[in-house]
Amino acid sequence: MAASDKSVDDSLYPIAVLIDELKNEDVQLRLNSIKKLSTIALALGEERTRSELIPFLTETIYDEDEVLLALADQLGNFTSLVGGPEFAMYLIPPLESLATVEETVVRDKAVESLRTVAAEHSAQDLEIHVVPTLQRLVSGDWFTSRTSACGLFSVCYPRVTQPVKAELRANFRKLCQDETPMVRRAAANKLGEFAKVVETEYLKSDLIPNFVQLAQDDQDSVRLLAVEACVSIAQLLPQDDVEHLVLPTLRQCASDSSWRVRYMVAEKFVDLQKAVGPEITRVDLVPAFQYLLKDAEAEVRAAVATKVKDFCANLDKVNQVQIILSSILPYVRDLVSDPNPHVKSALASVIMGLSPMLGAYQTVEQLLPLFLIQLKDECPEVRLNIISNLDCVNDVIGIQQLSQSLLPAIVELAEDSKWRVRLAIIEYMPALAGQLGQEFFDQKLRGLCMGWLNDHVYAIREAATLNMKKLVEQFGAPWAEQAIIPMILVMSRNKNYLHRMTCLFCLNVLAEVCGTDITTKLLLPTVLLLAADPVANVRFNVAKTLQKISPFLEASVIDAQVKPTLDKLNTDTDVDVKHFAAQAIAGIAAA
């Protein structure tokens, strides 16, 4: 008897512990217990999970949002733990309850789990258990339940009978007309996915009137979500129907009084273009695109500017060049000198992509003048976006033409009297070098990079040093050995001590990317020579450099060449030299 009692106690243990933990004052403990629900369910078995655990969770969970969110997430994966699809209906009550709470993230997760569980029901069980849940949510007093209802239509509709389908369409219409904006917003958000499962006949008779109504809502937050639905609906209809049923509303959205709605149209423009096809694009979308490119709101212009390349790429190939030249480029020219830097930057990130579409002649005639303006723009992002995408143009017109047209502008910027402009070009140089290739770089740009090392502004010299490291990473150590290290080593003999210091700074960073052989053979001898420099600043930088490059030297080299030099510097007459020498000796010993 005692053994029998013990087995009963053991079987009750998981649920008892769960109850205790869920009543604990510590939120973290409650959260952990929810995350272990599947383990507890396995211990209880399917029947007791259905008869004890699920009712307990349904009745007693009123907790912090974090705990409720974890519960909503767990229950979505619980079907197998309650006995499989034929018992999935047991999960509906707790999830329905969670779908009505105040916190949006909890509701959204509950709806996500409800959708998962609903899909696991048989068609018959769906009508018996899930559809009534949906209808209760639709007629709930609080807007929270009605917003959650919107997410369930598309999973229920395809598998129910015709009379129930009619009810669901009527319920959805009711939500589209709800007095609360949050509910209408949720309906607009789910309209597109619902449209995908509704028969074409009812899409036209029921859902498109809902779409038109939502697109005219007095709240712009509802109208902008209707724009997303527009894409889905346009994809589902034949061209004639799109023209008559969707386009009037789309035109209205493109010229909406709220910039947020127009912004959404701009964001979705290429998706809309793909949905409506080339003929409607040519007749209707090109004018709408032009309208948005001239929008009064900079946010809208920036959004549509980022779509210029993709919109043009998806134009009908027969008319593509003609449409770009006559209908798009005149507006793009205006954006090149837009007063807003975000708009100019957005355009600069895509404009080079027009080059392959227009071909060599039109690129030279039409696009290069715009690129030159953008290369000289005061906004660094604009210049960077042009330089970063030069490969598109290079592929079309070739390096020769590109260098003749754009290189003078780059050189001009590299030698600009404003040091910040010079700095910007230095920062773009690795990207530029990568696009133009090593041979071109050596011919046209290497001299510029070396010149920056001798700039009178320290920030430029510092940036130029880091630039050298990035170039070696790009082109490799053998290139560095041939192309730049000899020129840098010459600086160690310059009469101006600042040049000798820059030489040391370069050797510091080059050791990291050139490896042991080059560091030992080429870099170290020059550093050691500068240990006898007459200027104390150079000598203490030798000490710092020796410490910095020591990880890239063999131990025997450190013992034979580095340590004797540092010992000598440690007896220097200058206090700073002695300090940094001692620091280097200690640093190398500790390594």
Swiss-Prot record:
Tissue-wise expression: Expression varies in tissues throughout development. Highly distributed expression in early embryos. In late embryonal development, found at high levels in nervous system and gonads. In third instar larvae, found in brain, imaginal disks and salivary glands.
One record GO biological process: centrosome cycle
One of the Pfam families matching this protein, by short name: HEAT
InterPro entries named in the record: ARM-like, ARM-type_fold, HEAT, HEAT_type_2, PP2A/SF3B1-like_HEAT, PP2A_Regulatory_Subunit_A
Keyword flag Acetylation: yes
Modified residue annotations for N-acetylalanine: A2
Molecular-function GO terms, alphabetical: protein phosphatase regulator activity
Mapped HEAT repeat ranges: 10-48, 49-86, 87-125, 126-163, 164-202, 203-241, 242-280, 281-323, 324-362, 363-401, 402-440, 441-479, 480-518, 519-557, 558-591
Cellular localisation: Nucleus
Keywords attached to this entry: Acetylation, Nucleus, Repeat
GO CC annotations, alphabetized: centriole; chromatin; cytoplasm; cytosol; FAR/SIN/STRIPAK complex; INTAC complex; nucleoplasm; nucleus
Reported function: The PR65 subunit of protein phosphatase 2A serves as a scaffolding molecule to coordinate the assembly of the catalytic subunit and a variable regulatory B subunit. Key mediator of a quality checkpoint during transcription elongation as part of the Integrator-PP2A (INTAC) complex.
Protein family per UniProt: Belongs to the phosphatase 2A regulatory subunit A family.
Domain notes: Each HEAT repeat appears to consist of two alpha helices joined by a hydrophilic region, the intrarepeat loop. The repeat units may be arranged laterally to form a rod-like structure.
Subunit structure: PP2A exists in several trimeric forms, all of which consist of a core composed of a catalytic subunit associated with a 65 kDa regulatory subunit (PR65) (subunit A). The core complex associates with a third, variable subunit (subunit B), which confers distinct properties to the holoenzyme. Interacts with the inorganic phosphate transporter PXo (CG10483). Component of the Integrator-PP2A (INTAC) complex, composed of the Integrator core complex and protein phosphatase 2A subunits mts/PP2A and Pp2A-29B.
Protein name: Serine/threonine-protein phosphatase PP2A 65 kDa regulatory subunit
Protein source organism: Drosophila melanogaster (Fruit fly)
